[in-house]
Amino acid sequence: MPRRSARKAQSATASPADTNVVPAKDAPTTNSPPSTTSPNQAAADANQQQAGIVSSQSGPNAVGDSAPSTSVNNDGDIITRPTSDSIAAVANATKPAAVVSDPQSMKVTPIVNPSSYVCNVCNARFSTMSALSEHLRSDHRDDASTLLATPMINNAIRSFLTAWDGIRILSPDVSSKHLSAYLDSAVANGPELIVEDTGLCTSFMLLDNIPSAHLTKELIGFTWFMQMYQMTPPLPEGAVNRIVCMTNWASLGDEGRGLEVRLPPPTDSSVHAYKTVLSRGYIDNAQFNPLALRSNVLLMLLQFTLSNLKINKSSTFTSDVTTITSGRMIRAFEGRPELLALAYPGRAVLPTQTKNAQFLSTAIADRIGRLDRANLIGGEVSAMVECMELCDALTLHIRETYVMLLRSMHQDPTQIVQIVNECANNLLNSTIPISLRPTILCPWFASSEDLRLQQVMHLVNISSNTAAALPLVEALSTLLRSVTPLVLDPTVLTNAITTISESTTQTISPISEILRLLQPMGNDYAAFWKCIASWAYNGLVTTVLSEDAFPDSSQSITHLPSMWKCLFLTLAGPMTSDPHSPVKVFMALANLLAQPEPIAIGVPGMHQTTPASQFSHPGVWPPGFLNPQLINPQQAPLLRAFAEHIRANWPQPSEFGYGSTLQGSANLFIPPNRMVYPWPNQPLPRLTVAPTYDSAMSNWISTTIAFFIRVVNSVNMTATVNDLTRRTMTGVMTAMRQVKTMTPFYIQHMCPTELSVLASVTVTPPFQVPFTRLVQNDVITNVLVARVDPAQRGDAAVDIRATHATFAAALPVDPAAIVVAMLCGQTETNLIPSHHYGKAFAPLFASNAMFTRNQRAVITREAFVCARSAVAQCQDAGFLVPRPLDALRQFDVTSAAAAEIMHAVNDAFKTAFDLDGALLDGLALYGDPRIADLSAAYLQYGGNVVREHVPPGPSHIHRTLQQVESTFMAEMNLFNVARGNLYLVQTATNGNWSPMAPVAAPPFVRGGPNVRVVGRFGTIVPRPDGLEPQLIDDGNVPRDIAGDWVYPSDVLQVSVAVFCDYVWPMVKAGRTRVLVELGHYVYTLHYYDPQISLDEAPILEEWLSKINPAGIPPVPFCIPIPQVYPCITARRVHYAFTSENNNDSLFSTNAASIDTAFGENAAVSPLRWPGLVDPNYRVGTNDLPNRITLYNSLYRYNFTYPTLDGIMYVRSAT
C-alpha cells in the first residue's frame, strides 16, 4: 500500500489557523514523485518539506497516518475530515519515544487543494483533474492498472524495471558478436597441428668443427675461388668435421614448434641439454647429474621429437641442367638458395682429388631429385611427390609418423555433412559444393576413447582448481543467450501484479515488497541461463541457491519478506543442479514454521531452526521429507502438504540425444551421445509456438503458488496478518499463477534443442552425471579419479589414498532472477522455430570450432601416454612400458620427482602445439603422478559405485619417441654423450692419440688380476713411520694405492678430495691406473697442435675440482688436430681415454685434401649415405635404430587444409 505522509509527535491541539493556510497562487510544488493516492497530496508533500519532516520520521507508526485524511469525490472536489483526538492519542501512545531535533516537525502539515495534478505513471502535471483523466485515457490506455496502481506501487515498478534494465545486454540483438567471439576463441584454443616445412628434412648439421689448416697452395686457391663466387660446398671441408644435432637448421616455411634441440659441437659443453629436470637448485651450471641422466635424456629426446612434428611440404620442381644430372627434377629453394647444394651433393663435381671428391664420384645420378612419379594427376597436383635429397632417417621417421597421426584424424567431407546435420538436429541443410580431392586433409576426428580420456583430464584439472569450471558455464551460457528466441521481459510481471488493488491504509505494500525482492542480486541477470548451462556440466559444476536468498531461520512465517523468499526459493529450486535443492526449500519453510509446526529432524546437532542451506548431505535429510507420512497432519499440516507437494510435483529428469555417432562421444557415466535433462522434454515444434499449461514447469509454478496461497490463508497467518494484506497477497500470487509466460514451453521444447546443438560444438564436451532428484540413496556424494588400473586395485576409484574427491564446484545463483525468468519469458508471436534456429545455428558450423575438442582430445592422449611413459621409465617398478634407455643411470623417482617430470612433459606439449589452458596440469598438482592408468567413478549415498576405466588409445608420438630413444642408444655420440668407462692412465707419446676411438685392448678390467675396487666411501688409511697411505677396497681391506683401481662414479663423487690428494698424484707419477665407471656421460673435446708439447694434467685437475656429490662436469678429452702432411710432433702426456669407441659423430677429417698424414684419419662413410652411393639400396628403407643415414627418399606433400565453410555449404532447413 502507499505510504502516507507522516509526522513525528504531532500536537493533538493544533491551531485551526494552521490547517487553513492557503498557498499563493501558482506556488511551486515539489518535483518528487507523488506518494499518496490523491492528486492533492503533492502540495501536502511540499508543506511537509517546509515543516521540516524528513522521510526517516515517517512510517507505519508515524502521526501522518492520523492526520486529516483526504479523498476525491465524483466531482473532483476535496473532502476534508478533522483528525480524531483519540486516534492521535493512540498513535502517540504506540509510537516509540524519539528526540525531535527540528521544532518545525512538531507542526501539523497543512493539507490544501493542490495547484496542479500529477500523473502517477509519468509525473506529468495538469491544472485540472479533467485534463489528468483525459491524459490517462489517451496516453496510458494500454496500462491496465493505471487508475488502480498507487504512487508507491508505481515507484516500486520503476525501481524494479530500473534494476532489470541491464537485461537488455543479454538480448539476442548482439548474438552475432557473441557467437563470433566464441568461435574465434574456440579456433584459437585449438592445437597448432599444421606446421609445414619446405626446407630440408634434417636435424643434423655437417659442421667443420676445426677449420682447415696447412693446406697446399692449390687447395688454398680453390677454396678462395669457391668463397669468392659464394659457392656452397656440398660437404664440409674442415680439418675436423662433425655431425652436430641442430633441429630445423635447414627449415623453410612456417614457424617452428617453439622447441629446439640445438647442441653445440663437442668442443663446447652441452650439459644444459641434460639438466632439464631434477637438477635445478643444486647442480652447478657446468655439471650434470649422472643419477638423473635417463630422465633428462628422455626430456631432451621428447623435445627433439616434438620440434620435428612437421609436414614435409612440396615446393616447385625445376629441371637440372648440370651435366651429370641433366634432366633430373630438383626442387627450388626460394629464400634460401644455399640449400640447393646441400640438398643434392651428388650434383657437385670437385676439380681437385680430395676425400669429398672421391666420395661424390660414387654418387648415383638417378638418386637425385624427384623419382619417377607424375606430379599432376587428372590436371590436379598430386597429393604427394617422392624425391631423394639430404634427409636424415630419424627426422624423416618422426615426420612420417606425424603425417600418419594427422591422417588418422582425417574426417572425410562426406561424413562431415552427416555430422553437421546430426549435430544441428537436421535444422540445417548442408551440401558439398566442391569436388573431393585427395589433397584435402581435415584432421578433425577423435575416437570416443580419446574424448573420454580428455573428460577425465578435465575432471582432474578442475578438481585441483574448482574455479576452472566456472568459465565453462559462462561460455555455454553466452551461447545459449545468443541463439535462443526467448526474451525475458520483466514488464510482463509488473503488468500482471499491478492489476491487484491495495488498501491505502496498509502499512506494508505486498506488491512493493515482492518487486523489491525480485530485483536481481548483484545484477545477476543471467542466473537462469547459468542454471541451464550448468546442466551440461553437472559433474563439474553444481548450481546452488545462494545462501543470501534464504530467509533468516530465526524469522517466522508471519514475516512477509521471509515468506516471499521461501516462495521464490521453491519456484527456482528445480532449475538448479543441486541434488539437495528439494530438501533445502523444504527446510526453508520448516525454519519459518518451527514454532507452530515442529517436526523431527533425526540428526544429532541438526534442528528445525538450523539454516536450510546446511542440509547439503543425504545423511541429514529429515525423515519427514523422505516420507511425508511421518509428519502428523494435525500437528504440521502445512509441512506435511509441502513435503507431499515436493514429492508429487518436483520435475523428473529425462534425456535426449546430441552430437553425432561419427564424432565419437565423450560421455563417461551417460550412454553415448545422450544428455540428461532435469525436466521432462518433448520434440521441438518446427512451425509454431504457444504457451503451455500442462508442462512440468507450468505444473510446478501453478501447484507451488497454490500451496503458498494456502499458506497465506492458513491459521498461522490469519491470526497476525490483516485481511486486506492477505487478500492482496492472494491476488498477487493468483496473478503470478496466471501469467502467460513462454518459459515452460521453452524448457520443455526449445531448450533441449539448444543444448543438444550447442553441446555438439563447445570446446569442452558436456560432463554429466545422472540427475538423482528425490531418491536419497541415489544422491551422488563424490566424483573421483583413480590413477591405477582397476584390474589391479578393485577399490581404486573410491580409495582416498589414490584419488581426489570432487563433486562439482559450487556456483551460487539468485533465485529471484530465476523466478523472473520463469514468469517473464516471451517470444515473438509469429516465431517459426525451425526458421529461427536455422539462422541461429548456421554460424556455429561455419568454422572449425566444433572440431577443436576433438583435436585437443588427440593431443591430450598423446601427451598423457608420453608423460606416463617418461615417469614409468624412471621407476624401478611401475607401469610396464618399453625401456630403451634402461642402461642410463636413474634413481627411482619419488612422487615429487615424478611431478617435475610430468610438468616438463606437459609444458613441452603445450609449447609445441601452442595450447592455452590446462592439459595434464592436474596430474602433477596433487596425488602421486606415478600413474598406471586412469579411471573415473561416482559414489552414491547408498554405497553404489559406478566406475569407468578409460585407458588411452595407441599413441603415434609415443611410438616415435620410443624409436628415437632406441636410436639414441646406438647414436648417442651425435648428442655429445659417450658410452663406456673412463681410463685415467699416464701415457707419454710423440705419436698419434685418439682417446675417443681406442684401438688396443683395455689396460685392465674389473675382475682382472690384481685389480682392486675401491670401497663405497673411498676412505684413506694413513700409516705411521713414513709408510704410504692405503685405500679401503670393497672388501673393507686396506690396499696400497699403487696398482690398478676401479672407481665407481658415485664413490669418486663422494671422495673426490681423497682422490685428488692421494690417488691423482700417483696417477700422474705413473704408479696407479684408474678405471672410473661412468657408464654414460657427457663429454667435451679439446683439439691442440701436435707440434706443441702438452700435459693433460691441468685440464683433468680442473675437471676433478668441479666434481662434487651432486654432479660432475663433462669429461674432457684432448685430441691432436689432424695434419695434412708429415710434421715433427712434440712429446705429449695424456691420461684420459674411453673404454669404447665414441667417435661416431666424426664425419671426416681434412676433407679438402686427399689424405691425413698425422692424427685421426676419417673419410666420408658410405654407410651414412646408402641412398646416394649404394646400388643395393632399396628406396623407402633405413637402418634405424642402428644408424642414422643422411640421404634418403621421402614424400613431400601438397595437402590443403580447408575450413568447414570451405568444403560445405550450410543453410537453414526451412
UniProtKB/Swiss-Prot annotation:
Residues 28-51 have a biased composition (Low complexity). It comes from the Viruses. CDD domains: lambda-1. PROSITE patterns: ZINC_FINGER_C2H2_1, ZINC_FINGER_C2H2_2. GO terms for molecular function: ATP binding; hydrolase activity; RNA helicase activity; zinc ion binding. Keywords: ATP-binding, Capsid protein, Helicase, Hydrolase, Inner capsid protein, Metal-binding, mRNA capping, mRNA processing, Nucleotide-binding, T=2 icosahedral capsid protein, Virion, Zinc, Zinc-finger. Residues 1-80 are annotated as: Disordered. It is found in: Virion. InterPro entries: Lamba1_VP3, Lambda-1/VP3_sf, Znf_C2H2_type. One of its GO terms (cellular component) is T=2 icosahedral viral capsid. Residues 8-18 have a biased composition (Polar residues). A zinc finger (C2H2-type) spans 117-140. The keyword Transmembrane helix does not apply. Its main location: virion. It holds the Pfam family zf-C2H2_6. One of its GO terms (biological process) is 7-methylguanosine mRNA capping. Homodecamer; each decamer is made up of two conformers of VP2, called VP2A and VP2B. 12 homodecamers assemble to form an icosahedral capsid. Interacts with VP6. Belongs to the turreted BTV-fold inner capsid family. Inner capsid protein that self-assembles to form an icosahedral capsid with a T=2 symmetry, which consists of 120 copies of VP2, with channels at each of its five-fold vertices. This capsid constitutes the innermost concentric layer of the viral mature particle. This is Inner capsid protein VP3. It comes from Aquareovirus C (isolate Golden shiner/USA/GSRV/1977) (AQRV-C). The gene is S3.
